[in-house]
Amino acid sequence: MSGRLSELAAEFGMVERALGDPAALADPQAYTRLTRRHRELLPLVTLLREREALESDLRGAQELLSDPDMRELAQNEITEATARLEQLGAELEVLLLPTDPDDLKNVILELRAGAGGAEAGLFVMDLLRMYTRYAEDRGLRLNVLEASESDLGGASKVVAEISGEFAFRAFKWERGVHRVQRVPATESQGRIHTSTVTVAVLPEAEQGEVQLDLSEVRIDVFRSQGAGGQGVNTTDSAVRAVYRAGTPDEIMVVCQDGRSQIKNREKALVVLASRLAERERAARDAQEARDRAAQVGSGERSEKIRTYNYPQNRVTDHRLEGDSKNHPLDSVMAGGLGPVVSALARDERERQLLAASAEEARDGAA
């Protein structure tokens, strides 16, 4: 582990020097990559510096053990420093685990009503409100790009952009099928209905990440529509971008958030590129799964990941076990997703640590 830590500390120094060079500003994309890498390495380097300071304090305290007047104080310092050094070792081990390169990216969030008809559409909007509050609590911005709303206050589909630092890391756990169990407002017999909403979370494609051939994209413009088909402005500002129309590869994106056709066109192309990048990633993942003859469940879009039980005021995340899988529904729906996300991230780190330990054991045996 020490060798890898030294390499990363040296890399951090090089990144800092590069950022301090005025020439770095001449290439905005390179500068963005440098600042991102700096943010990624800073937590690890901060812990390394704390460890170095503690090791120095520990050596000083050990030298004082021979002084009868200072022995008790020195022993206390040694005990505290040793405990913290052990804790730092565990924290550094976690930071050395593989990280998701998409964690820092913005997010394209898609909510689609599934089984349950109008009730599923209403839950789409409930989830949108939950995600909006969650994003705000984390200093992120959620901007709705497209909403196919109904007269009942629901929506069959909502597409939103979430921007800000570590947006994808905050939302990546949400992809999958969300199930809601509750008594609809229109249910006169008091029966509990079950509905579903599918959530897709795509890391927003960055400039140059996907080569989008604009000759394969058809751009349509039309007037923005509100709930029930009511027009919300009198200009053709809404944009529909269709990639490879009429083919099995077709991807359609609609953006009608802004009043500017130019801005809607730019955002539609960003969403289109993000979906294309996700399609390419999914194809690579599927090939890797076939190559190793194993199916990794946590990435499947069709999985039921969470149940929202209104009568029992309980949210159950089916990827977790024990006490960590159940959470108070009223808190979660108010945007309090933090404990759920923390439990999922902690569970993932534990799996990675086990895998790393197993790999080290195999290497040692070899």
From Swiss-Prot:
Methylated by PrmC. Methylation increases the termination efficiency of RF1. One of its GO terms (molecular function) is translation release factor activity, codon specific. Keywords: Cytoplasm, Methylation, Protein biosynthesis. It comes from the Bacteria. The keyword Cytoplasm applies. Pfam families: PCRF, RF-1. It is found in: Cytoplasm. Its main location: cytoplasm. Residues 283-293, 315-328 have a biased composition (Basic and acidic residues). The modification N5-methylglutamine is found at Q230. GO terms for cellular component: cytoplasm. Residues 283-335 are annotated as: Disordered. PANTHER family: LD18447P. Peptide chain release factor 1 directs the termination of translation in response to the peptide chain termination codons UAG and UAA. HAMAP family: Rel_fac_1. Belongs to the prokaryotic/mitochondrial release factor family. This is Peptide chain release factor 1. It comes from Deinococcus deserti (strain DSM 17065 / CIP 109153 / LMG 22923 / VCD115). The gene is prfA.
